[in-house]
């Protein structure tokens, strides 16, 4: 069997919603589901190994195992044909989930869990895994409906991470039997104008020329993929404005939004760009963040 879909649980309602989404993703891929709960002593944040002392029915470790068992049952109810395994892994949530993602085809987490502070829009696990995961990371947002309908929205910006995101978006759309909405937003103040092939020709400077360049960027980013995925219809949108606003707006009609972890405008050293962070906080549907192969290694 191919690499499983990974999902993290913490006993929250958001965690169980993520399990249902992850189970559907596993079923579409024809693979298994690995459900993980990271366990540590909550007062001192010290990892707690199983103890030979005390009743087997008691203690926090047993509660953690029951939590995982309930998540496995929930996965079985959501997708009866998916083989789901549960594991209580000793350690803090952030490094445990990042390490577990090495062997996963996809990692799924809720947008917030029991550890989120009141008022926060996004939990630390979702942000950390999106930035450090070794596989694509799907953060469950919106109503958390596993069967939410609509196109897969792909954010296109011409970056290496964006290219990996487009590939993932096409594969995901094919699995779901839906189409792609490829969105590229640009600003005339940030547009990159390529030099003319003819040295004697003038540089593009008018709004029409700039728009044509952005249309070309989108076409080049999609080139070849429509041939590989002939059954996936593609709708293209080139919008003048900010990518964050454009993609958040597109998320209202989407089943999933897919973006690269960092785009062309990302600062060196940043693992998660402003667009992906904005979507993780404000999108109206689940968000998949894809890092380039170079960034994952």
Task: Label each residue range with its predicted role.
Residues 10, 72, 112-113, 157, ...:
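Short glycine-/small-residue-rich Rossmann-like dinucleotide-binding loops
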Residues 34-36, 85-89, 138, 183, ...:
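General small-molecule cofactor/ligand-binding pocket signal
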Residues 5, 67-68, 97, 166, ...:
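Fold-core signature of tandem repeat domains
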Residues 21, 63-71, 213-221:
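Short, solvent-exposed amphipathic alpha-helices that sit
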Residues 1-54, 150-204, 226-228, 233-237:
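Small/aliphatic-rich secondary-structure junction motif
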Residues 53-66, 202-213:
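A short acidic, glycine-rich active-site loop
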Residues 19, 24-28, 94-145, 252-297:
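Gly/Ser-rich helix-loop-strand patches that form or flank binding pockets
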Residues 1-2, 14, 21-24, 55-58, ...:
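Structural beta-alpha unit
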């Amino acid at each position: 069997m191919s690499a499983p879909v990974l999902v993290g649980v913490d006993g929250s309602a958001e965690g169980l919603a993520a399990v249902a989404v992850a189970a559907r993703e596993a079923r579409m891929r024809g693979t298994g589901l690995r459900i993980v709960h990271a366990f540590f002593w909550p007062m001192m944040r010290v990892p707690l190994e199983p103890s030979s002392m005390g009743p087997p029915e008691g203690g926090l470790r047993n509660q953690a195992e029951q939590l995982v068992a309930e998540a496995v049952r929930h996965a079985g109810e959501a997708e009866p044909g998916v083989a789901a395994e549960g594991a209580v892994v000793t350690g803090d949530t952030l490094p445990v989930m990042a390490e577990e993602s090495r062997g996963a085809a996809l990692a799924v987490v809720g947008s917030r869990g029991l550890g989120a502070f009141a008022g926060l829009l996004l939990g630390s696990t979702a942000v950390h895994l999106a930035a450090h995961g070794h596989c694509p990371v799907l953060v469950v947002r919106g109503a958390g409906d596993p069967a939410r309908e609509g196109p897969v929205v792909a954010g296109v910006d011409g970056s290496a991470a964006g290219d990996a995101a487009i590939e993932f978006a096409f594969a995901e759309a094919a699995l779901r039997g839906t189409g792609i909405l490829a969105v590229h937003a640009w600003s005339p103040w940030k547009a990159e104008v390529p030099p003319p092939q003819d040295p004697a020709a003038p540089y593009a400077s008018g709004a029409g020329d700039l728009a044509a360049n952005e249309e070309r960027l989108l076409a080049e980013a999609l080139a070849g993929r429509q041939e590989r995925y002939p059954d996936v219809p593609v709708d293209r949108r080139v919008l003048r404005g900010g990518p964050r606003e454009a993609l958040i707006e597109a998320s209202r009609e989407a089943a999933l939004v897919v973006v690269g972890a960092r785009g062309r405008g990302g600062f060196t050293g940043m693992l998660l760009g402003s667009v992906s962070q904005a979507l993780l906080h404000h999108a109206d549907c689940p968000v998949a963040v894809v890092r380039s192969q170079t960034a994952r290694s």
